[in-house]
Amino acid sequence: MYLLVNFIVALAVLQVQAGSSYIPDSDRNTRTLQNDLQVERDGKYRYAYETSNGISASQEGLGGVAVQGGSSYTSPEGEVISVNYVADEFGYHPVGAHIPQVPDYILRSLEYIRTHPYQIKDYYTGELKTVEHDAAAFNVYTRNIQDHTIPQSRPSTTPKTIYLTHPPTTTSRPLRQRRALPTH
């Protein structure tokens, strides 16, 4: 049994090693055509590389602050995929023909939302208030303690008793005493 387990483990290890060494025929003889790297003392850097199978990339910037660059490769379908990007304090902004664009109906709805602000009726005053589309929407519900506005109507806060099963028994004797003792 021990020999069988060792054999299965060895076979699994060989299978993993054989699977990880596979290189497509188109990439077996790939050579690096260009490989440049420049790093300066102030943190600025620039690198670029290109391979014989059509993969290329370049990037430059100031480490941890802002970078810009791009890369390209040929897809299995033969289409050249190219991405250019900028990454800075405003985020990562990729540009490429293969990246989906925001549909027109979404852009139109965002414009409509921007030009037609949301209005909320104040619970206490009944006044309609325009709300900006950010955290200010929650400020409508916060009230100043020094504001002595009296609510016009208030819902009843009187507690009601609700029995989930049966109402309590009216007898004051414990359950043991209420049971009749068995007679023999």
Swiss-Prot record:
Residues 147-160 have a biased composition (Polar residues). Residues 175-184 have a biased composition (Basic residues). Keywords: Cuticle, Signal. One of its GO terms (biological process) is imaginal disc fusion, thorax closure. InterPro entries: CHIT_BIND_RR_consensus (IPR031311), Cuticle_Struct_Prot (IPR050468), Insect_cuticle (IPR000618). GO terms for molecular function: structural constituent of chitin-based larval cuticle; structural constituent of pupal chitin-based cuticle. Residues 147-184 are annotated as: Disordered. Component of the cuticle of the pupa of fruit fly. This is Pupal cuticle protein. It comes from Drosophila melanogaster. The gene is Pcp.
